[in-house]
Amino acid sequence: MKRLLYGLCTLLTVATILRTAAQPAETPPTPAPGSAAAAATTSTTPTSAFEKRPVALERDFGRLYGTLTVPARGAETAVLLIAGSGPTDRDGNNRLGIRSDCYRLLAEELTAAGYAVLRYDKRAIGSSVLDDPTQLPELTLDQYIDDAAALADYLAGEGFRRVVLAGHSEGALIASVAAQRSPAVAGIISLCGAGYPIDEVLRLQLAGQLVPAHMELFVEVEQIIAALKRGERVDMTYHTQGLQALFNSGVQPFIISQMRYDPRQELRKAQVPALIVGGGNDLQVPADNVEALAAARRDARKCIIPGMAHTLKACAETTLEGQLHTAYGDPTLPLAPGLVQAITEFLGGL
C-alpha cells in the first residue's frame, strides 16, 4: 500500500499551491561568504565549469522564469528539468518545508558532465507568477504540459541539437505528454514518476483507509471520483467535511485534468527513447511504479537506484519521519550515487 501515498500527496500539494502561489515569492537572504549557511548551499561543481543564464519565456499567463546552465565548452544536448507536484521551485525546494536543492544539484552535475540543463519555476510557482491571480483555481495539468512543450521548442530554437525532457514525480507524466506535443524532443526521463493513474491510486488508497469500517464514506468517495473522472465538477457542500477539504472546488479543475491521463499509456505514446528511474527508498512513489511503466514501454531503459529517496538524495532512512529530516530537509545531502551516471549513459546513447 505504500505506493498509494502518491495520490494523497498529489491532492494535498495541489491544495497548497492554491493557498500559497498567489503570495509574493520569498527571496531568501544571501548567506555570508564562508558561513555555515553558505557552505550548506554550495555545489561541489565549480561554477567556472559552466555558464549560468536567466531564461524568461512569454506565455498566456505571464512569463515562465528559469535558469539555464551550459558547459563552458558548449553542449549539443539540452535537458529540460520538470519539477514535481506542489509549489516546488526550480531548485527543488518549496514552502511546505522541503529543502533539498535536488534540482539545482542535478542540473549542475549534468552540466559538469557536458549537458546543458534548463530548470524552471512552473506556472504559478516561484517567480512564474500569474498576471491575473484570479485564474489560479483554474490551473490544470494541461497548462503545465503546454508550458513544458514550449520550453522544449525554445531550447531547440537556441541551437541545441537534442532536447531531452527529464520529469520528476508529477513532472514525469508532464514529460511524457509534452514529448507528444513538441517535435523538438529527442528523449524522456522519468525520475520517480508514478506508474498508475491518479483515480486508481486514490480509490485504492482510500479503500485501504475506509473499508470495511466506513463503507458509507467510501461509497461517497467513489461517487466523487467517478464524477471527476467524467470531467464533472462536484458540489461539495453536502459532502462529509473531511472530503470537502480533499476535493474542494479550488483543486477540482486540476484533478479533472490529471485524471485524463494514464502514465503508462502516455509513456507508450511518446515515440522517443525513454529512461525510467526509481528509488529503492522512495516512500512516495515506490519502485513497483518503475515496473508498471516499464511494462508499458518494453524498449525503455529502467534503473532502480539503491538507497535513493523521492528527492533523488541518498538516504538510509526508510520511514517518512526519518526522511523528512534528511532527504526532504537537508540540502547538504548528496544526490544518490549512480543517478547521474544512469542519466548520462542514457543521454550519451541518443
Q: Which role fits each region the language model picked out?
A:
Residues L136-G157:
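Alpha/beta-hydrolase active-site loop
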Residues I189-R264:
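Accessory cap/linker subdomain of secreted extracellular hydrolases
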Residues A270, I276-G278:
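Short beta-strand/loop motif that positions the catalytic acidic residue
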